[in-house]
């Protein structure tokens, strides 16, 4: 269209409104906003306990590599809603493209197993396949570290995840990027604002080192905003206070409305 306008004395339109539209699409895409989906880790384990009879690492690994999908029946309301959420994610991605939903956040992540539980449910819903002939990962998985104890275990959780060859394959299918969300509110309620900020700072450095060890790009998602106790304050000051190397070309932050 632009070439046609330029060839037919339409420079004002081609270099004006049309050019601005093209630049906007290049920058932001055609999707209004990419959504994140978030669920508590215990909900995933509850669903898997009903379907598989457990959610240990051995059970999850076996199910992740199974070609067949177990029959999901007689689920309680919360487990049924959880699985329907994954099915809805697949439907939206298939209809509108991969930009509509990119990240699935697991709140109250205490171990790598909490993330793998969500991965297995995603596999059941058709969002993940690790079969060599047709491997794909339509969404990425984001551990949310909220309490001081989880922040102090951040490096161990991420290292265990990335050391799992099946999970690492998912990361590679997603462009070699691992996102981790850091919670400001719960850690502040746990130990106060000073300890919370210091533990978040240390967690970022440890996560950075683990990402370098495994040769993946780290994208930190800061769940900050609102009051000072929830990490609020000027964004510029927050950015320049981040540890060296923790921004690997990408960063995410919540913006309170």
Give residue spans per PLM region:
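Extended, charge-enriched "interface" segments that sit outside catalytic cores
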Residues: 1-95
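Catalytic or ion-translocation cores adjacent to nucleophile or general acid/base/metal-coordination motifs
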Residues: 125-257
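Short helix/loop capping segments that flank catalytic or ligand/cofactor-binding pockets
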Residues: 14, 33-36, 42-45, 114-116, ...
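Hydrophobic alpha-helical scaffolding
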Residues: 8-11, 75-79, 104, 108-111, ...
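Generic, well-ordered alpha-helical scaffold segments in large soluble proteins
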Residues: 1-4, 8, 21-24, 28, ...
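C-terminal amphipathic alpha-helical interaction region
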Residues: 58-63, 68-119, 128-142
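A structural signal for short, well-ordered beta-strand segments and their strand-loop junctions
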Residues: 27, 105, 220-222
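Generic alpha-helical secondary structure signal
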Residues: 16-19, 80, 84, 113-116, ...
